[in-house]
């Protein structure tokens, strides 16, 4: 009876119901409904995200966000404090840049582009941190895009970064942006177990 009723409906419509259901199943197999909902929410929330250049008023935010994520897994190292306590002197005055992500007007993420004194690498992408309550909105990726765009403005050729494979969302973002893992690893931090590079294309 159900089959007959469905066939009657199919005859009364322009599209074959079973074909439509099959197409839905194919699309959902490629990407789940939950994933589609998350992506739609992320796109909607991006309207409330803005990246601005660093100002001294964000010094405490720059430090606190970085301390927060580092101490979740590791300890703060002296090399960290050089940059976190003195961002103007150690990053900006040396030719680098810091970016601050605002969500609904509040600072929730930071990222630095540090000028490198290196024969191969022009800048290091570093100090990327997003407040836990603001994670999942694509803010980290947006900050990375801002840093890469600035590097392009500065005619940089290759970017460098150091991270840890425990930070799976961050590693996924870096790979999505085109960063490739380096075969040799000479970490500047104890927590560093992966180094990557991005060859910028114009």
Feature locations, PLM:
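Short, solvent-exposed amphipathic helices
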Residues: 1-12, 16-23, 27, 68, ...
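Conserved N-terminal entry element of GNAT/NAT acetyltransferase domains
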Residues: 3-9, 26, 30-57, 200-202
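Acetyl-CoA-dependent GNAT
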Residues: 46-49, 53-126, 131-133, 144-146, ...
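Conserved beta-strand-loop-alpha-helix junction that forms the acyl-donor binding cleft
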Residues: 135, 160-170, 187-191
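Conserved GNAT acetyl-CoA-binding A-motif
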Residues: 151-163
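Conserved active-site tyrosine of GNAT-family acetyltransferases
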Residues: 174, 179
């Amino acid at each position: 009876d159900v089959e007959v009723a469905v066939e009657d409906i199919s005859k009364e419509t322009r599209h074959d119901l079973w074909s439509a259901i099959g197409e839905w199943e194919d699309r959902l197999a490629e990407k789940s409904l939950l994933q589609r909902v998350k992506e739609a929410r992320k796109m909607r929330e991006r309207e409330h995200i803005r990246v601005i250049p660093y100002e001294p008023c964000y010094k405490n935010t720059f430090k606190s966000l970085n301390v927060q994520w580092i101490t979740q897994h590791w300890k703060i190292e002296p090399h960290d404090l050089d940059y976190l306590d003195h961002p103007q002197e150690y990053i900006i005055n040396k030719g680098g840049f810091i970016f601050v992500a605002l969500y609904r007007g509040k600072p929730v993420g930071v990222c630095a582009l540090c000028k490198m004194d290196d024969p191969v690498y022009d800048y290091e992408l570093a100090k990327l941190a997003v407040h836990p309550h603001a994670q999942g909105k694509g803010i980290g990726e947006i900050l990375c895009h801002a840093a890469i765009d600035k590097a392009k403005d500065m005619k940089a050729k290759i970017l460098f970064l150091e991270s840890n494979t425990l930070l799976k969302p961050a590693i996924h973002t870096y790979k999505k942006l085109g960063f490739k893992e380096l075969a040799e690893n000479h970490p500047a931090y104890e927590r560093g177990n992966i180094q990557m590079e991005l060859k910028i294309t114009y």
